[in-house]
């Protein structure tokens, strides 16, 4: 079983509706109950910011600062991490000229937020993701890249560098005259980054597909069949250099078409994640709302198991309103599955009774009026 990573202390200052809040925790799961709007998801969002990126809501950092707070927000966590006990502090100081996120690890400024992945991996499932299979492809790409990032921390940097290069190419193409040699240099960079992104996605999907096949009988949730579409389909058995040459050629040949369109029409930014309900052999978007939710839960739990298997450390799970639409039997099975992953999970709900099957495996807190109390 993977080693357990768990948060032992959490302190928030001027974060969302919390002027100040502190939690002292043990290694068990954490259940947060309270009325809608009390701030349960806000606390989960704070934990999600212990990973690279903008957290589970993808909010601008300035937007998570408590109204009327004088100097931004801060989050402090102490955890038993992948490299022993560690203290992490992160936040934004709005008195600075920049609102860039600051990060300290054991009191030392970090060079990049990617250093967070040396200490823990954080995965989440929220009600906002319920429309993942029926919404636009951009949301599925973002979801896909979060899955990849938890296994390959460099993926986020490659993706942002690719986007930057693509914007430069689009800008050059918008000019009536452009320098072909300069454009070729940008396209070579895009080809290198774009193929690296695509291969990382394909590798993660292959690993996840194999794990799902191996564990189908051990879960009450439906199995997802996964496929990528929209970029170099069926060609990823070729060497990476051949793929880079092929993509660079596509970009070169598509210059005038892309100039007319005002955007780059080929690349990893056009990829879509296709999901099928394996047992019913049905596209996920055609499944019922309940089936889609069950598919998504099963997919997240399978990915959490994969992260634990490959890193040797179980991820911290954030499961917002996870029990709301499950019957008692499936809730109990879900809690058992979460327990077997070997990590610490944070779960929210309005009714503590929904989590009764956890028993002593969890610590319970009530959230109300910008405060958190043990219950």
Swiss-Prot record:
Transmembrane segments: none annotated. It comes from the Bacteria. It is found in: Cytoplasm. GO terms for cellular component: cytoplasm. One of its GO terms (molecular function) is ATP binding. ATP binds at residues 34-41. The keyword Chaperone does not apply. GO terms for biological process: DNA replication; DNA synthesis involved in DNA repair; double-strand break repair; SOS response. SUPFAM superfamilies: P-loop containing nucleoside triphosphate hydrolases (SSF52540). Keywords: ATP-binding, Cytoplasm, DNA damage, DNA repair, DNA replication, DNA-binding, Nucleotide-binding, SOS response. InterPro entries: AAA+_ATPase, DNA-binding_RecF, DNA-binding_RecF_CS, P-loop_NTPase, RecF/RecN/SMC_N, RecF_2. Its main location: cytoplasm. The RecF protein is involved in DNA metabolism; it is required for DNA replication and normal SOS inducibility. RecF binds preferentially to single-stranded, linear DNA. It also seems to bind ATP. Belongs to the RecF family. This is DNA replication and repair protein RecF. The gene is recF.
